[in-house]
Amino acid sequence: MERPVTEADLTFDHVPETDQSFENALTKARAGDRLTVDDAIELLTTGTDVDGIDQTRKERVLEAADHRRADVVGEEVTFVANLNNNVTTACNVGCLFCNFKDAAHTFERDTGMESAGFTKTPSESREIVADAVSRGVYEVTSVSGLHPAFALDGEHREILEAHPEPKAVNYKPPEAYEIDPGTYTDQISAMSVDGVHVHSMTPEEAYHARRGTDWSYEDVYGRLKAAGLDTVPGTAAEILVEEVRDVICPGKISTEGWLEAMEAAANVGLGLTATIMYGHVENEAHRAMHLKRVRELQERVDGAITEFVPLSFVHQNTPLFEHDVVSGGASTDEDELMIAVSRLFLDNIDHIQSSWVKYGDEQGLKMLSCGADDFMGTILSEEITKRAGGEYGEYRSFADYVDLVSSIGRVPVERSTDYETRRVIDPNDPPFGPRLGPKSDGTPILTPEERAPLADD
């Protein structure tokens, strides 16, 4: 058996276009000048003239990013009342960084196997979302595995059913499975309850929703919008450099496909977010090139990207780690520099998110002094990171947010998904609960009794 590919096998060698230095890059960053890829590499590495991270230089980068954050968005730290309703773990793409998926064949009726995963019907999704909305939640995020029975809608299912080689388009009929996930439009429509904001259908899912057809991404996202989709999460980006994708997700949507899908979503009037998943086989040059592609995309979509979310790779339980392709994830220094350089480089995206799911509360708060200004959401369920070995739970109450944000002297602010609606929260005026949703009245989302089992997990 051949040994697994490692970072050392990557042939990528970035050659700077101009003479660069850390000091030049930092001077440009402090002045608010637009940074180049070469500048970003200098800042991410704290200088290509040194080995490892220079702690003094790192602090100067973080300080510059924190000043930029204050200039752009002030002292507010935002968060949203949201639910994660991931529909299915069934998938057969085989991304090496993922432990969310379960092999799709284990969900089939005739295998005699008991799957460790789950699939929800549209009616189950509606019930889950309706309950969350009644508690004050006003955003539902849904990112799922690429279930072979998924089709965009009824017309798409007819096309897939008639395909001469269904295996070639990764399709099996719903009857082959214990549970039918319905279609993508069924699920979106089911989750569109009582005015809740539906944030779903990544470019990868849109790619799956057009397989076997000549439909454009505009066709796909137009139908999803009609079904109730409001905004598109920019996950599945990972690193937008093909040689990295060839290692970590060779069966996944390409860089160009991801960018095309995101532009299409914006073209039909859907809002966007964007991400980077770093800390595996890529290097700082790959990260910098990714940032450049996101910045260029934001220009093409006329500012439709509301936030950028750096996602630190959680390595435990993933094939990359178990096959010795990587020995761990990003260091704390790398995490802080990723947030900071994202703030300094992405001069056309106002909001940078700190993910407590990835970093934990203490380090997540530190990121709010490294350039980040958003602190995610309540997240009633977070299966993806938890299944990969994440250690930081899956729920934060508004009271948690008020305590955490106030502890660093910043202003806690409830926001809508698109950041257009905001409510400053007075730390001296409890109880703390959402008020921006269709059924929000300030009541905490979970009672103390309901929350107790989560604290015991």
Question: What positions do the PLM features span?
Answer:
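Auxiliary Fe-S-binding modules of radical SAM enzymes
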Residues: 1-52, 56, 63, 133, ...
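Glycine-rich, proline-tolerant flexible connector loops at the mouths of alpha/beta enzymes
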Residues: 41-44, 81-83, 113, 142-179, ...
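N-terminal pre-triad scaffold of radical SAM enzymes
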Residues: 60-110, 117-144, 232
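Short, well-ordered coil/turn segments that N-cap beta-strands
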Residues: 71-77, 136-138, 192-198, 228-231, ...
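Active-site mouth loops of central-metabolism enzymes
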Residues: 82-83, 101-123, 205-216, 247-252, ...
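Generic structural signal for well-ordered alpha-helices
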Residues: 125, 129, 184-189, 218-221, ...
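Conserved strand-turn element in the central/C-terminal portion of the radical SAM core barrel
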Residues: 140, 145-150, 198-211, 240-242, ...
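Radical SAM/AdoMet-radical enzyme domain recognition
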Residues: 140, 166, 170-174, 178-274
